[in-house]
Amino acid sequence: MITLKELKKNPYLIEFIEQAGERLRLLQYTDHGLDHVDLVSARARNIAREIGLSKDKQEMCAIAAFCHDFGNFLSRTYHNYMGAVIFQQLFQKDFTPSELAQLMQAIVNHDKYEMEFTDPVSAVTILADKSDVRRERVTVKDKKVIEEDIHNRVNFATKYSKLGVDKKKKNITLVLKIDTSFVPVIEYFEIFTDRMTYCRKAAKRLGYKFNLVINNFKLL
């Protein structure tokens, strides 16, 4: 198995990620480029380490999280499936069949809320990705344009975002601080209810409980 550091040397992968980010930026989506996947990858590695997964599993979680969104360079629709297939074409020789299958499953599962997670790599990837809510993800600069889109509004209003793991209490907690002068907290739930369901299911697969704290109030 190659490492994330080695995988990042593939020029096709990096180009696809950069084009995915640029394509969605032009469509006024939140960031899905290198900044997003670098953060999600680091978060996935940390979750995997904190819950006690093996070194190899930690590496796989970091890799799946880094690669989960690059299919967007082709299309937003079915980007998870396209990303998984292209990943297989790029890296088939670098992983065992079992490793490759788990990585492809994680890339596909990150965007299918009805899927059941059969391995920890998919579950960790979901938690790392769906918890990435923060002001820095807003690519639009015009505040009037930001105010017109609920996803941009909620991300822009999120001044602080941290995902923590308490191994002793078996809790995985997302802590957010939202500027309620810009958006009411209810708008967060209007767009992220499905994501929180993802996170709860993923945490349960790992033997943990998912908690959500917004502005010092525990909501889940």
Can you say where each PLM-predicted feature lies in the sequence?
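Non-transmembrane, amphipathic alpha-helical segments
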Residues: 29-32, 116, 187
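Terminal helices and disordered tails flanking the catalytic cores of nucleotide-processing hydrolases
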Residues: 132-220
